[in-house]
């Protein structure tokens, strides 16, 4: 079911999009949902978005490490991003997607996310004055125009963090 918006909201959104088209501004953020959290990633830090392929299980790994995905001959380590944050496991069906990250850093990693929420503009958000997030890979907390909380992901910090790199069980 689609969200109902007022005529005023529609006109404001349309005017903003037309202004962006004239000035050449791009929507530089990708919105994703992982469990109950909404995340924003810089488009420059992301790769392809895929329907989850068959995953090869890897024994003796943490429950958030879902296995390996073969994407056109390249193996990607797949992390259930919701489960990594102690959320519910993400079923690899329906609207779930595999988001390839880290190629610019020489890392073949993929995040299994609940759904992709589309492209966003930085102007769609304002800083959240609430508490800071303790996770070092959270660049900042922001809120959209409907006052929903979002988290900006710093993929290079995530990919370099020991909690993310240590997928093996103890």
Feature roles, as predicted:
Residues 1-170:
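An acidic, low-aromatic, low-complexity terminal/linker signal
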């Amino acid at each position: 079911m689609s969200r109902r918006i007022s005529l005023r909201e529609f006109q404001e959104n349309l005017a903003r999009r037309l202004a962006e088209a004239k000035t050449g501004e791009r929507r530089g953020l990708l919105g994703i949902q992982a469990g109950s959290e909404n995340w924003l990633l810089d488009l420059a830090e992301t790769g392809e978005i895929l329907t989850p392929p068959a995953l090869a299980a890897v024994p003796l790994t943490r429950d958030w490490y879902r296995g390996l995905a073969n994407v056109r001959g390249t193996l990607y380590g797949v992390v259930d991003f919701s489960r990594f944050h102690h959320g519910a496991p993400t079923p690899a069906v329906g609207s779930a997607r595999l988001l390839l990250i880290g190629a610019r850093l020489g890392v073949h990693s993929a995040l299994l996310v609940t759904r992709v929420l589309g492209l966003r503009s930085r102007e769609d958000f304002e800083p959240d004055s609430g508490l800071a997030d303790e996770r070092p890979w959270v660049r900042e907390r922001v809120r959209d125009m409907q006052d929903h909380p979002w988290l900006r992901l710093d993929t290079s910090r995530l990919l370099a963090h020991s909690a993310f790199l240590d997928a093996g069980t103890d």
